[in-house]
Amino acid sequence: MLSLFYQRISTYIKLSASSLLSILPLYRPFQRRRLTMPSNEGSISSSSTTRPKDVLVVGGSYSGLAAALNLLDLCQGRSCRFAGALDPEISEPAEMRERVPVQITIVDERDGYFHLIGTPLAFASEEYALSAWRKFADIPALQTPAIKFIQGSVTRVDCERKISTIKEAGTNNEISQKYDYLVASSGLRRTWPSAPQSLNKDKYLEEVGEHIAKIKMANGGVVVIGGGAVGIEMASELKEMHPDLRVTLIHSRAKLLSSEPLPDEFRDRALELLHETGVETILGSRVIRTTQTELNGAATPSYTLSLTDGRTIKAGYVINAISKYSPTTAYLPSSVLDKEGYVKVNSALNFTDEVPNAKYHFAAGDLALWSGIKRAGRAMHHGHYVGMNIYQQLLNERFGTKPKFSEMAHAPPSMAVAVGKNTVAYGTEQGVVSGEEIAKIFFEDDLGFGICWRYLKLGEAPK
């Protein structure tokens, strides 16, 4: 599911806000509308006695962390950490960087940041899995009194009173917490193996260990069901990490990635790269039944898969990678949700006016009802804009300045899929590109973990 970067990338794509964020499979996704903001000269200066504004961020993944950290940068008088992605002429001018006291609370069901893009590799390599999950308490960028973390889930939001109800993990104690601004960035509920189901690192490592143990015992090979991005990446990473393992991918449609609005050239190239990796494929036939054979003294289990075309396939382990997901928005008023549960937003990522105090409520990332294929790069871009827009409102409240909001542009479909050592990518301007060099640009050698970590500056302690 994405990426960002430095000198090596400028040789391939012009370094700009859009290209920087395209590195997490999307190309030139957004533009920023520039408005004029009056100078703050003569306004009331910051005071240490002013009550900090409380910002509640629901979800601590790509969009939530991007919103929290960019907002904190601005409120502490610095350029936001994503400002390097912007051309100098659209970066925040110095007069915008007034200090504003802020207290940010991040609520997440997990005890840490998990690099979701790397899920296929995490489920193939225990060594990689260990680094893909970082506890919030161990992330240097979050170690500041201005950021508080609660492991738990938000169960209700009262937009009119600006009060949330939070259920703490472990104790199930309910906390009533007031806020001045809310960022809904809790993402999508993904089924296994699109994401680990564990909520703390120790359990996650057990989950991964059990899965990889079954892979190693699969004498009859592994079958991956589903030819979307998750299935393709899962199958190819298994083959890369376990080259002697027979891996077969089964997809019910004639083309891979059949649910995405992408050109056939992209789908065909993904299939070619999958075959180059050594993965076998069966297309155009659906699995209608999976039967586990009795062990009868055998050391490893065996499975028989029956297909709609009459064939039967034997396997030592079966992975159902047909992605199922839904927005995690049950805590929000139904009036701001569409029929599928996505949050209705305007171009500044505010809730639409169906709820009271809409301008104090934002949605970012996969749960926001906005155009484009949902990707981590886009989620971080959402968070960036939300952070800047909250800061603009804080300046308005504190100094009376006219807000200069950053507005999202609608984005066409774009995607990059890692296929072993290669990557195939598509954008409306670039078309379909693929190869190992493309993989280095989009994912480096760790499915984008280092790229996202550096871009979010998670390893840098607060100044």
UniProtKB/Swiss-Prot annotation:
6-hydroxy-FAD binds at G59, G60, S61, Y62, S63, V154, D366. Its cofactor is 6-hydroxy-FAD. Its EC number is 1.-.-.-. Pathway: Siderophore biosynthesis. Keywords: FAD, Flavoprotein, Oxidoreductase. InterPro entries: FAD/NAD-bd_sf, FAD/NAD-binding_dom. GO terms for molecular function: electron-transferring-flavoprotein dehydrogenase activity; flavin adenine dinucleotide binding. GO terms for cellular component: cytoplasm. Induction: Expression is induced during iron deprivation and is regulated by the transcription factor SRE1. Binds 6-hydroxy-FAD non-covalently. Oxidoreductase; part of the gene cluster that mediates the biosynthesis of hydroxamate-containing siderophores that play a critical role in virulence via intracellular iron acquisition during macrophage infection. Belongs to the FAD-dependent oxidoreductase family. This is Oxidoreductase OXR1. The gene is OXR1.
